[in-house]
Amino acid sequence: MGPWSRSLSALLLLLQVSSWLCQEPEPCHPGFDAESYTFTVPRRHLERGRVLGRVNFEDCTGRQRTAYFSLDTRFKVGTDGVITVKRPLRFHNPQIHFLVYAWDSTYRKFSTKVTLNTVGHHHRPLPHQASVSGIQAELLTFPNSSSGLRRRKRDWVIPPISCPENEKGPFPKNLVQIKSNKDKEGKVFYSITGQGADTPPVGVFIIERETGWLKVTEPLDRERIATYTLFSHAVSSNGNAVEDPMEILITVTDQNDNKPEFTQEVFKGSVMEGALPGTSVMEVTATDADDDVNTYNAAIAYTILSQDPELPDKNMFTINRNTGVISVVTTGLDRESFPTYTLVVQAADLQGEGLSTTATAVITVTDTNDNPPVFNPTTYKGQVPEDEANVVITTLKVTDADAPSTPAWEAVYTILNDNGGQFVVTTNPVNNDGILKTAKGLDFEAKQQYILHVAVTNVVPFEVSLTTSTATVTVDVLDVNEAPIFVPPEKRVEVSEDFGVGQEITSYTAWEPDTFMEQKITYRIWRDTANWLEINPDTGAISTRAELDREDVEHVKNSTYTALIIATDNGSPVATGTGTLLLILSDVNDNAPIPEPRTLFFCERNPKPQVINIIDADLPPNTSPFTAELTHGASANWTIQYNDPTQESIILKPKMALEVGDYKINLKLMDNQNKDQVTTLEVGVCDCEGVAGVCKKAQPIEAGLQIPAILGILGGILALLILILLLLLFLRRRAVVKEPLLPPEDDTRDNVYYYDEEGGGEEDQDFDLSQLHRGLDARPEVTRNDVAPTLMSVPRYLPRPANPVEIGNFIDENLKAADTDPTAPPYDSLLVFDYEGSGSEAASLSSLNSSESDKDQDYDYLNEWGNRFKKLADMYGGGEDD
């Protein structure tokens, strides 16, 4: 080969290498992973919700879920690609084909074909599952990294790694080895992350750091976690990532380690007696935690193991092997013979050849209306008083062979010949008896006896043609004394309110319904609140006993006066009927208009007008328009004007500025019929400005006496009376003439002197303190009869001291008070002493001699006896003989 040939070969090689180096990864193409999918189902009958398989669509956007659609409405495709059965499905052909559609991000439509194959139980193929046990593990390599934001090829998607559950070990066990192409360039270290690696459950999977062997460390449980998603990482010795993380999906394959479980221990159902074969009774349901998509480990089959009782046939019921629906298979169900059946049902997986469990199904045979109710007896009699409703006449007895308290047993009674609806039959829910009662009052005078025909049926119709039982009831009506009946019950009479007293208004009578009795009716008024009416007890004629008044708001409502009239017969017992008399009172012009309000207030400054409404108790035309006029000089200070066209109100305002005070305004009001009246308005002018509603009422102009002034005047009068009384007492005392205590000296000879005071003996230091009592305060009340007492001030006497040491001061002070006491003896009373000593030292009266000389008549010594004898000394001492 020449130099040119070698150069050309080198150039071609260089171009090939350059083309290989510049080649970009294959772009992502949207679409299904496969053009068709084939799924195998274990049986021709599929229940609702059965999972058939899964399709996968790649739309190159990274979305985890896709919207799928199928034209076959029997199947549903979820957003995760899982295909399920929408409703119970039965295969008529060995295969079913249908299309599944999906759309990419540009709304291009893609489709794939799905085929369902059914296989017989005897040659059922089990799905192939690649297990790592006993075979050489697969080698996984990292895909070539791409530059930029480009997706990897679809060929790089790692298929799921299958690992059986419940393996025995030994552990750890190799699953797969992960290799990086960069291990030729240097040392590469491997690690994994994700569920089962570094997130719970942690440590289920591990990877050898240098060799890349992915291992499982313990037995797996598919019922706990069915799929693990891991990410493998490759880094260089200096810690730099040499590969992009690679997703690894580990699927735990199922083992038949769970037996079916019934949703209930005891299932209860019911079926009517006489049900035909094929009638569904109930459904039992069991579940299995094993895989029901890829294996038969959860394919449950139902069977009936036993039936109790086995009569009238040991196979009265059958169960659907796939759905668990129990149905009647044989005729002869009779509630009266066998009311219940107990079935033991079994649920087994692997289509009935695997693990199994049992449950109980209790079937109750319900009653049908195949027995009619029958009267026993068929004839009845009863009595009822007339005019009484809801009265029990008699009780009807029936028997029914059907189940008690069921619609087929409950009786329904019908009266065949009660056209007037006068009777009713109700059913006693406890014993099914019929209770015949009156629906409304009966009239003895109209009919004395009723013969009723009553039929009985059930709540539900008869299942077969049966004869309806009937009974005959004879009802006798008893005559009672009925109350008289007013005709009409409510009588309306129009009368003028000025109807004369004592005149007859109307006649209101009642008739006696008891035509077979001769009775007398007496009338009287039961309610007459205004006491306006009186009635003739024999004829029922009603007349007035007082003047009527339509405007009496207490007794008249809407111009109507209501009175109650009663009529009483003389039967036994006495019966009374009631009638209502409505007197419609027509209006007369008997009320003059009046103002409202009658008390008003104005402000002194800038007063605002006040509106006065005109009220008339009469009715039109005896009311508005009204005429208003100020009288008795009120128009000098005030003015009025009408407030509305109908003249039903006026406006009052002052003509000029008025002084603060109270004013009386005479206002004359006249109605449309010239009925007038003068009313006095109380008007107050307040010390305010503007609206009078914000000011207080002014003080009255006239001076008046208030309570404090009255009390002051009374106090002054009382003080004046006391002063006059004291003055009179003082003048009376001045007018008293002093009379000598002793007769003149000429008449004193040979006479015995009488003294008012009898001394208590000589002074003695020995005295009894207990006799002092309370001092002079305890002196007796002895009143003089010869001299009228005068009103004088009394000196103050000290009370007896508790300390005996102070008794001397007590005596001295009270002696001084007694000396200055004008009421002291001898002018007021005789002194009374409780203790006068144990004897008298005075000489006998016979030793007293009459004095005959002037010396003996010397009374100057009386001046030495103190103040107590001063008056006596003044009268007898120092005097000259005339």
From Swiss-Prot:
Q: Where does Ca(2+) 3 bind?
A: 288
Annotated residues that bind Ca(2+) 2 are located at: 257
Biased composition annotated in UniProt, kind: Acidic residues? 755-767
Those parts of the protein on the Cytoplasmic side are 731-882
Q: Which Pfam families match?
A: CADH_Y-type_LIR (PF01049), Cadherin (PF00028), Cadherin_pro (PF08758)
Q: Binding of Ca(2+) 1: at which residues?
A: 257
Example GO molecular function: calcium ion binding
Going by the UniProt annotation, this protein carries glycans at 144, 280, 285, 358, 470, 472, 509, 558, 576, 578, 580, 637
Question: Key word Transmembrane present in the record?
Answer: yes
- Where Phosphotyrosine occurs, the residues are 753-755
Q: Which InterPro entries match?
A: Cadherin (IPR039808), Cadherin-like_dom (IPR002126), Cadherin-like_sf (IPR015919), Cadherin_CS (IPR020894), Cadherin_pro_dom (IPR014868), Cadherin_Y-type_LIR (IPR000233), Catenin-bd_sf (IPR027397)
Gene Ontology biological process terms, A to Z: adherens junction organization; calcium-dependent cell-cell adhesion via plasma membrane cell adhesion molecules; cell migration; cell morphogenesis; cell-cell adhesion mediated by cadherin; desmosome assembly; homophilic cell adhesion via plasma membrane adhesion molecules; positive regulation of protein localization
Q: Signal sequence: where?
A: 1-22
Domain note for this entry?
Three calcium ions are usually bound at the interface of each cadherin domain and strengthen the connections, imparting a strong curvature to the full-length ectodomain.
This protein's name: Cadherin-1
Lineage summary: Eukaryota, Metazoa, Chordata, Craniata, Vertebrata
Q: Which gene encodes it?
A: CDH1
